[in-house]
A protein has these predicted regions:
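Aromatic pocket-lining residues of Rossmann-like dinucleotide-binding sites
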Residues: 23
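N-terminal Rossmann-fold NAD(P) dinucleotide-binding loop
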Residues: 16-17
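N-terminal Rossmann-like NAD(P) cofactor-binding module of classical short-chain dehydrogenase/reductase
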Residues: 74-77
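Conserved N-terminal Rossmann-fold NAD(P) cofactor-binding segment
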Residues: 31, 35-72
């Protein structure tokens, strides 16, 4: 695994949240950034997932962000609905 690997997930609904959880539990990245137009959902999903992975041996940093975070992202997942 590359160090400091950032994954940005656009869309904090069911698909984006489950994708973030799977990535967290498989120790694939160091940081997961949620982006969603519903800022309350974005924040609550990030907080819930951060609580879920808190006791993992190497839990990623989970936070909310904006589209500038996509610039240095290693992977961008688009899970936003149409």
């Amino acid at each position: 695994m590359l160090s400091n690997r950032r994954i940005v997930i656009i869309g904090a609904g069911h698909v984006g949240t489950h994708c973030a959880a799977a990535l967290s539990f498989q120790n694939i990245c160091d940081e997961i950034v949620f982006i969603d137009r519903d800022k309350e959902k974005e924040k609550s999903q990030a907080m819930d997932l951060a609580d879920s992975v808190a006791f993992l041996q190497s839990a990623p940093v989970i936070r909310v962000g904006d589209y500038k975070d996509c610039e240095d992202a290693d992977i961008i997942v688009i899970a936003a609905g149409v």
